[in-house]
């Protein structure tokens, strides 16, 4: 499994749950969660393969910033 970590500006738990649902619809075999306690509002995705550009696109299309943490 690969793990990719993203920095976001998602601050509301309810919205993070909606975004997780959208991401799970696109990536059904992935484990996806937000760490809302972290200052970078971390989005963590674990899967066999990950398409960071698609994840970023989904968050951006919902009005949120998202970038891969390096």
Task: Pin down the residues of each PLM region.
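Short glycine-/aliphatic-rich beta-strand segments at the starts of folded cytosolic domains
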Residues: 1-11
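A generic structural motif
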Residues: 41-45
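Gly/Ser-centered flexible loop/linker motifs
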Residues: 28-31
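Conserved short beta-strand edge segments in small beta-sheet-based binding/regulatory domains
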Residues: 33-34, 63-70
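Short amphipathic alpha-helices in soluble, non-transmembrane regions
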Residues: 19-23, 55-63
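Short Gly/Ser/Thr- and Asp/Glu-enriched loop/turn motifs at secondary-structure junctions
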Residues: 36-40
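Short amphipathic alpha-helix segments
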Residues: 10-26
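Helix N-cap motif at beta-to-alpha junctions
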Residues: 47-52
């Amino acid at each position: 499994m690969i793990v990719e970590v993203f920095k976001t500006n998602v601050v509301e738990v309810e919205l993070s749950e909606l975004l997780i649902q959208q991401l799970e619809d696109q990536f059904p075999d992935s484990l996806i969660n937000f760490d809302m306690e972290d200052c970078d509002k971390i989005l963590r995705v674990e899967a066999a393969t990950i398409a960071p550009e698609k994840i970023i696109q989904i968050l951006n299309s919902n009005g949120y910033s998202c970038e891969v943490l390096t």
